[in-house]
């Protein structure tokens, strides 16, 4: 056998060897020993890691014992002889990707902020650690307060590169309105505590009502909030005081210069600029007016403002000063071929339009009413120092006639610098009148009359022939 092995080693196929049948039993025993060693080796490592006394063993076994090494050396190089390696018992946690926020490690011996390897660094688009703002140590992991603070700071503190917040200012206002005080909703009729078995809300008096009005947080973002009855009543009383204190004559205008046939269209045209306090039937019947022109406050609808009108003029009182200024811009417009005038109301202008004396009174005549109002319903006013007061005397009815409608041309209240004044131009035209006209026309007429008289005195045949042929007298 030794001679055969020497010859084989001398040949070029040095890696090929013939295993004798006697060495097959030894080879099987060698495999069994290797399997037993592989099973025993991890248990020894586990005991060493857990603290049991054991002989120090290397993690990677390089060579088997010396008894087997001689036998293994006889095996060729291509024989399956893997290296024995130890499987570590400790599991290392690895991050699959870069996290948005730093992860706090559970082990106390490993520092939380280990930036040597480049992981857990604050990079673009990541949040900052809230413990930096609160000065919390990285090893302080057992306190619940720090976790609460960090969660609050994570929602409040924002980075310039992160996504927009999930909560808005409106949500914070709603939360403040809900949790501000428990006595805010005492007078709310929708609450179950304020509703009895009969279904009627019970009013619970609150001793802190004046304090609640000042300290209550008003939620301007909530559309379902309603004003309390106390605030509504105070607003209504304030509105009534304003209506009583305002002088509606300052918002009044006078429209003049239109014929009575287009009186309704004139009123409807000026009703588009604002709410009119006079109760005109034309405005009631007109269904296409905007809802803004309708009266909303009950105090103004109950009060019927008197109507002052005459032949070709009417007084309109607006609810706001803005509507009056818009209506005054319509001064000088032409409607249906007529020039319309619009001026601010004043007692002097009204007196000039109606040509009334101080003792006479202004009559209320509705343009569309067929029956005249009774004298009891009329409110009589007398002009005393520019203010109308109630007269104690009996009502005296008088009609405004066309002859009394006189407006002086020199009155300053009706003058407009943009308005054209048309003068009398009848003297420019030649008319057959008996009066002697001055100027060129009068001289021409006088010469013609003299020629006629001279021609009549001469009754020769030549003159008669000329008159018959040419007809000079007909000129």
UniProtKB/Swiss-Prot annotation:
Domain RRM Nup35-type residue range list:
247-352
The known PTMs are summarized as: Phosphorylated by CDC28.
GO biological process terms on file? cell division; mRNA transport; NLS-bearing protein import into nucleus; nuclear pore organization; nucleocytoplasmic transport; positive regulation of DNA-templated transcription; protein import into nucleus; protein localization to kinetochore
Instruction: Specify the protein's topology with respect to the membrane.
Output: Peripheral membrane protein
Q: Where is the composition biased (Low complexity)?
A: 22-41, 232-244
Q: Is Transport among the key words of this record? A: yes
Major location category of this protein: nucleus
A matching Pfam family: RRM_Nup35
Phosphoserine modification sites? Answer: 101, 297, 438
User: What residue spans carry the region label PSE1 binding?
Assistant: 405-438
Q: Which UniProt keywords apply?
A: Acetylation, Cell cycle, Cell division, Membrane, Mitosis, mRNA transport, Nuclear pore complex, Nucleus, Phosphoprotein, Protein transport, Repeat, Translocation, Transport
* GO CC field: nuclear envelope; nuclear membrane; nuclear pore; nuclear pore central transport channel; nuclear pore nuclear basket
Compartments reported by the entry: Nucleus, Nuclear pore complex; Nucleus membrane
> How would you summarize the oligomeric state and partners of this protein?
Component of the nuclear pore complex (NPC). NPC constitutes the exclusive means of nucleocytoplasmic transport. NPCs allow the passive diffusion of ions and small molecules and the active, nuclear transport receptor-mediated bidirectional transport of macromolecules such as proteins, RNAs, ribonucleoparticles (RNPs), and ribosomal subunits across the nuclear envelope. Due to its 8-fold rotational symmetry, all subunits are present with 8 copies or multiples thereof. NUP53 interacts with MAD1-MAD2.
* Remaining remarks: Present with 2060 molecules/cell in log phase SD medium.
Give the protein's recorded name. Nucleoporin NUP53
State the organism of origin.
Answer: Saccharomyces cerevisiae (strain ATCC 204508 / S288c)
């Amino acid at each position: 056998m030794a001679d055969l092995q020497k010859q084989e080693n001398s040949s070029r196929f040095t890696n090929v060897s013939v295993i004798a049948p006697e060495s097959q039993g030894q080879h099987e025993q060698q495999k069994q020993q290797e399997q037993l060693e592989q099973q025993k080796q991890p248990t020894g490592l586990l005991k060493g890691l857990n603290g049991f006394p054991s002989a120090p063993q290397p993690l990677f076994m390089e060579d088997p014992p010396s008894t087997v090494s001689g036998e293994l050396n006889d095996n060729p190089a291509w024989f399956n002889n893997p290296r024995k390696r130890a499987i570590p018992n400790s599991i290392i946690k690895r991050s699959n990707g870069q996290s948005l926020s730093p992860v706090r490690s559970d082990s106390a011996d490993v520092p939380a902020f280990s930036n040597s390897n480049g992981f857990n660094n604050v990079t673009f688009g990541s949040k900052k650690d809230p413990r930096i703002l609160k000065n919390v140590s990285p090893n302080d992991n057992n306190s619940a307060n720090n976790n609460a603070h960090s969660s609050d700071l994570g929602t409040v503190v924002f980075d310039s590169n992160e996504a927009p917040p999930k909560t808005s200012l409106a949500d914070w206002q709603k939360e403040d309105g809900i949790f501000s005080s428990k006595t805010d909703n005492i007078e709310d009729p929708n609450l179950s505590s304020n509703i009895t078995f009969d279904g009627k809300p019970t009013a619970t008096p609150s001793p802190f009502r004046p304090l609640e009005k000042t300290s209550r947080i008003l939620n301007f973002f909530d559309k379902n909030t309603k004003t309390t009855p106390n605030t509504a009543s105070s607003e209504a009383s304030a509105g009534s005081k304003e209506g009583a204190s305002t002088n509606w004559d300052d918002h009044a205008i006078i429209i003049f210069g239109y014929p009575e046939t287009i009186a309704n269209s004139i009123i409807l045209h000026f009703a588009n600029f604002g709410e009119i306090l006079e109760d005109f039937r034309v405005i009631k019947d007109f269904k296409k007016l905007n809802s803004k022109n309708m009266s909303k406050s009950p105090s103004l609808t109950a009060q019927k403002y008197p109507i002052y009108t005459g032949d070709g003029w009417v007084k309109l009182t607006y609810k706001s000063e803005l509507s009056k200024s818009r209506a005054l811009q319509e001064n000088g417009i032409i409607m249906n071929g007529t020039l319309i005038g619009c001026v601010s109301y004043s007692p002097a202008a009204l007196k000039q339009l109606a040509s009334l004396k101080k003792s006479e009174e202004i009559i209320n005549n509705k343009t569309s009413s067929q029956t005249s109002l009774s004298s009891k319903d009329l409110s009589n006013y007398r002009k005393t120092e520019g203010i109308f007061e109630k007269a104690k005397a009996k009502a005296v009815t008088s009609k405004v006639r066309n002859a009394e409608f006189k407006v002086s041309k020199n009155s300053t209240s009706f003058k407009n610098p943009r308005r054209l004044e048309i003068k009398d131009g009848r003297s420019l035209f030649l008319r057959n009148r008996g009066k002697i006209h001055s100027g060129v026309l009068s001289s021409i007429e006088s010469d013609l009359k003299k020629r006629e008289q001279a021609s009549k005195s001469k009754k020769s045949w030549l003159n008669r022939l000329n008159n018959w042929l040419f007809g000079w007298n007909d000129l």
